Amino acid sequence: MEAAELRTLAEVEDRHWWYKERRNLLARELRRLGTPGLALDIGAAGGGNTRVLRAHGWRPVALEYAPTAAQIARERGIDVVRGDARELPLRTGSLDLVTAFDVLEHIEEDYLAAAEITRVLRAGGTALIAVPADMALWSAHDEAVDHVRRYDRDGLTQVISKGGLVIEDVWSWNVLLRPVVKLRRKSSEGSDLDDVNPILNTGLKAIITAERYLPVKSLPGVTLFLRARRP
């Protein structure tokens, strides 16, 4: 991802509806995991997820590949390690949790990253993974933020399972707004990562929050979430 895109992400993620609800989703997953331990946040970027981990009692290690992203994280008070998800600089079996939100789609050899996530987890440890869904939504936005692919359920579960993890759940997110996203990106000429009018931001946040209470997780969405464990 270009340095300018990373800077924009850091500027908007604290207030942007999409990032706020994604952090809420992470928090709900953390509450169901039980006793906190040592966690790795791959692709920490602006540090939003790292702060959620810390707030819930986890001891997070933030990892970034891009120098600009690592610098941004440090500027925001996050201790970050430079490293490659395909060759994690951590001991085998040393972690209780790995989060990788919007990471795998940037990596050509995503299967190597999946195997590394498995390697660094202890037996019984959990991986929480989020990726963009459905190549039908491919657009100039994906190209602008250096995506290699978008995933369907079978493709994502195959990569993670071959890496050695046991899948516990896979679900769609940002389902209700998928038609809006598809329409906008059809005519887009670049990244749609930008600030949002406060009134519109509040409305979009209300819509995506409503998904928590609706039976839509099996329907097509904009993002796929996956929870898995190391056997």
Regions found by a protein language model. Give the residues of each.
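Conserved N-terminal segment of class I S-adenosyl-L-methionine
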Residues: 1-93, 97-101, 111-114, 193-196, ...
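Residues lining the SAM
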Residues: 101-104, 130
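A structural helix-start
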Residues: 107-111, 131
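A short glycine-rich, Lys/Arg-flanked "PGG" loop and its adjoining helix->strand segment in the class I
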Residues: 111-126
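C-terminal helical/coil "lid" or tail adjacent to the Rossmann-like core of SAM-dependent
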Residues: 177-205
